[in-house]
Swiss-Prot record:
Motif 'KMSKS' region, chain ranges: 267-271
Record's protein name: Cysteine--tRNA ligase
Major place of residence: cytoplasm
Catalytic activity: tRNA(Cys) + L-cysteine + ATP = L-cysteinyl-tRNA(Cys) + AMP + diphosphate
E.C. numbers: 6.1.1.16
Binding sites annotated in the UniProt record for ATP: 270
Binding site for Zn(2+): 33, 211, 236, 240
Short sequence motif named 'HIGH' region, residue ranges: 35-45
């Protein structure tokens, strides 16, 4: 499918849905803010991955060459704090949880990024960016840190709509700041923390700087689309724009933000204790069903989790799966065809997946009627179109990804990667006789539906009432 009809996307910076015109014809460059690998992933984390995987798949279906960069934040305050609390090296903590995120994305068939840079691998580029900002008069040193001078950039607030007098960075009071609205580019060295040498002394990067430097390294000074969760609009993305453009870069031309997964109207968050872990969800539903559910709402909408909504999604997915199996059994092989015009119109209209799904189920109803009437050609056309459309959404029931393996085994394999990360931390806590932490990890796993049994061969885990590994 190479027809490139007009694609319209909601640009947060413009505040409207507008025509998407790539910087280079036929090519699209995308940067997605990936995980801060401080803990295990929950479904709120992976919704962003699914939402923008659909964008990527749609662009590929339209014939575009897509460069898709998703970073890993592997050095950050929360990572350092949690690693220290667990008595583990920060780099080990980050690497362990990075593997868990990779397993979660893979379980839901989120396409691997073109590149997945880690923040710690791009310190040189970050230092170079700070040097440019200082030379341009947009950054200064103070108290061992380096800060961005917010008042030096008159366009500050263009993404979030924040008025300059209302800006609160959430960094707390710092003696080295000229103005408390300024934000940190580089943090001076502290005892027990990792640090790198710079012209301003040893230290480590600020969170906002990391993404600007990595995006530029892989996509150049200007690129098409920057994606992320809506909670990143301010201050993270606002600060990325300010520092990148102040350094002379055009940076992102479109800004897309996905809504949260909520429970009881509140954002799913570990700090609120209302998370649904990937192990728990993969115990209850198949990976393809979970992906269907996470992608079913419009990407900019909040996705309020409920058991009823989850089961409705499972029922809808199984209905499509059953239809495709009926056609294959009664008619023959079903190859992916082309999406219908209504499906294409829906995705071209700011990725309106709910309308696209309505079209898919309309085609299924037509196909069932054709099959019941003995119209095998009509049923096959419907089935082929459904395969194409569901493939773009990343959950085609007849795709080899889901058909060529036992999905239960696949889900257990993904869960095993996630659980082993926690079991490793528990074993290290036990070695250090930190029984409170070991018990806390065991309790956390149990709340996620995982029972841990200590044996002579080491800890074994099992799903409550299910399989053992």
């Amino acid at each position: 499918m190479t027809d490139r009809a007009r694609l319209r996307l909601h640009d947060t910076a413009a505040g409207v849905v507008r025509d998407f015109v790539p910087l280079r014809p036929g090519h699209v460059s995308i940067y997605l803010c990936g995980a801060t690998v401080q803990g295990l992933p929950h479904i709120g984390h992976v919704r962003s991955g699914v939402a923008f995987d659909i964008l990527r798949r749609w662009l590929l279906a339209r014939g575009y060459d897509v460069a898709f960069i998703r970073n890993v934040t592997d050095i950050e305050d929360k990572i350092l704090a949690k690693a220290a609390a667990a008595g583990r090296p920060w780099w080990e903590w980050a690497a362990t949880h990075e593997r868990a995120f990779t397993a979660a994305y893979d379980a839901l068939d989120v396409l691997p990024p073109s590149a997945e840079p880690r923040a710690t691998g791009h310190i040189t580029q970050m230092i170079e960016m700070i040097e440019r900002l200082i030379q341009a008069g947009h950054a200064y040193t103070g108290g061992g840190d380096v800060y961005f001078d917010v008042l030096s950039y008159p366009e500050y607030g263009q993404l979030s709509g924040h008025k300059i007098d209302d800006v609160h960075q959430g960094e707390g009071v710092a003696a080295g700041k000229r103005d408390q609205r300024d934000f940190t580019l580089w943090k001076g060295e502290k005892p027990g923390e990792p640090s790198w040498p710079t012209p301003w002394g040893r230290g480590r990067p600020g969170w906002h700087l990391e993404c600007s430097a990595m995006a530029r390294s892989y996509l150049g000074p200007e690129f098409d689309i920057h994606c992320g969760g809506m909670d990143l609009v301010f201050p993270h993305h606002e600060n990325e724009i300010a520092q990148s453009r102040a350094a002379g870069d055009g940076f992102a031309r479109y800004w897309l933000h996905n809504g949260w997964v909520t429970m009881g109207g509140e954002k799913m968050s570990k700090s609120l204790g209302n998370v649904l872990s990937m192990p728990a969800m993969l115990q209850r539903v198949r990976p393809a069903e979970l992906r269907y559910y996470l992608g079913s709402a419009h990407y900019r909408s909040m996705l309020e989790f409920s058991e009823t909504a989850m089961q409705d999604a499972v029922k809808a997915y199984v209905g499509l799966e059953d239809f495709l199996h009926r056609v294959r059994t009664r008619v023959g092989a079903v190859c992916p065809g082309d999406p219908t015009p209504r499906f294409a119109e829906a995705l071209d209209d700011d990725l309106s997946v709910p309308i696209a799904l309505a079209e898919i189920h309309h085609v299924r109803a037509e196909g069932n009627r054709a099959l019941d009437a003995g119209d095998h050609d009509g049923a096959l056309r419907s089935a082929s179109a459904i395969r194409a459309m569901m493939g773009i959404l990343g959950c085609d029931p007849l795709d080899q990804r889901w058909e060529s393996r036992d999905e239960t085994s696949a889900a257990l394999a993904a869960v095993d990667v996630l659980v082993q990360a926690e079991l490793q931390n528990r074993e290290k806590a036990r070695e250090q006789r930190n029984w409170a932490l070991a018990d806390e990890i065991r309790g956390r796993l149990k709340r996620a539906g995982i029972e841990v049994t200590d044996t002579a061969e080491g800890p074994q885990w099992s799903l409550l009432g299910g399989d053992t590994k």
